[in-house]
Amino acid sequence: MNKWFIRIPLILLGLLAVLTLLAIGAFRITNPTNGSLVSSGETRRYLLYVPESYDPTVPTPLVITLHGFAQWPANQAGVSQWNDLADEYGLIVVYPAGTGFPMRWRTSGAPGSAADPMQDVTFISDLINKLSAEYNVDPARVYANGLSNGGGMSFVLSCKLSERIAAFGSVAGAYSLPWSDCNPSRPLPAIVFHGTADPIVPYQGGLAGRSGFSLPSIPDWVDELARRNGCDAAPQDLEATGDVSGVQYMNCAGEVIFYTIAEGGHSWPGGGYLPKIIVGNTSHDIDASRTMWEFFQKHPLSGEEN
C-alpha cells in the first residue's frame, strides 16, 4: 500500500509532464514564426509579412503589431488582418512574439527585474534594426500597435522608443506602465479604440479580468495622454457610425484620437472574430486596422527626429 502512495504522485507528475509537452507542441504547431534574433540574451521570434509588391528600391513603411496576453503572432495576424492592408498599400508588417507561456509582453516592472519592460523594448529596437538591414524600411514610417497586453506594449514603445516609432495605436489596451515611467523625447500621435463592455480590460477601469491587476479608466487615461501631448482640454466629437463614437483632441504636439465602441468587447473592431462568450461583442462599424493606417499616414517622423 505504501508503494502505491509513492507511485500515484509519480504517475500524476508523469501525466502532467506529458500533457505539458503536448500543450507546448500543439502551441508551436499553431504558432508559426519565420524569423528570429537574439536580444538581451534571449532568442526572440517573429512572424514577418512582406507583400509581393515590395520593391527594394523604394523606402517602405513598417508596421509592428503586437499580440495580446496568451496569444501569439499568427493569432494577431488573423485578428487584425494587417496583411490585407500590406497587400493594398505596400507595407511590411511584423508580428513579434512575446515571452513566457502563456505568451505576454512585459509592460511594467522594476528595472532589472524579470518584468522589466526594457527587455521587450530592446527586442523591438533590435527587430527594427534587423528588418532595416534586410529590407528598405523607411525610418520615418515605423508604427506600432497592438491588442490588450500588446496595446499596453505599444504604449510602452511610445514612451521608451519615441525616437524610432512615428505613431502608435491600441485596441482594448491594458495600460499598466505608470505615467512617471513615460518620458518620451517627443509626444507621439496616438489612436485608441476601446469597448464599453470589455470584460477583460474594463472601460471604466478596475481589475483586469481575474488577474487582480488594477487598470485605469480608459477615458481618463486618454485625457491624460492628450494633456501630455499638449492638446486642448476639450476634444471635438467625430461623426458617429453605428455603435462607434469618437473624439479628436485639438492643437496637439502629438495628435490623439479616441474611439469608443458602445457595448464593444475585448476584440479588434472590423477584424477577425474572437469567441463572444469570452471577449464579448466585435464591432464591424469601424475597421480598426484601416483607420489606424489612415491615421499613421498623416504622422511620419520629421527630418529632425529620424
Model-flagged regions — what are they?
Residues 4-62, 74-80, 85-88, 116-120, ...:
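A domain-start/cap signature at the N-terminus of enzymes
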Residues 65-68, 95, 260:
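Structural cue for short, hydrophobic secondary-structure segments
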Residues 68-72, 77, 101:
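Serine-hydrolase catalytic-loop signature spanning alpha/beta hydrolases and amidase-signature enzymes
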Residues 97-119:
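Cap/lid segment of the alpha/beta-hydrolase catalytic domain
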Residues 113-135, 156:
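Alpha/beta-hydrolase active-site loop
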Residues 192-194, 198:
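Short beta-strand/loop motif that positions the catalytic acidic residue
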